[in-house]
Amino acid sequence: MRERDDEWTGLMRSAIAGDSAAYHRLLKAVTPVLRAAARRGLARAGQPVDQAEDIVQDILLAVHLKRHTWDVSAPFAPWLFAIARNLLLKHLRNRC
């Protein structure tokens, strides 16, 4: 897991510096992990997992729009998963 986090952090640093290929690789790498996390979160809450794709798209959009707020000296994964957690909770609140 540490290798994955280091890889994601490096890709995000490169993306922030303007490397669009690194940004594409990062999004491709995080998407299945986010999808699995969204499906798990929905299932634990007793919600249909078919909403996972919508949540993943919301997360990826938020990452794109907020990428300038990420501290490049910090690991990327905790920042990403904080966004994911917050958007999943928002989705669950809106469903109730």
What are these regions (language model features)?
Residues 16-17, 40-46, 57-75, 94-96:
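Sigma70-family region 2
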Residues 51, 75-76:
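A conserved beta-strand->loop->alpha-helix hinge within the catalytic CA
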Residues 34, 38, 42, 67, ...:
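Hydrophobic-face residues of short alpha-helical interaction/recognition segments
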Residues 1-2, 17-25, 36-58:
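Short, charged helix-capping/linker segments at alpha-helix termini
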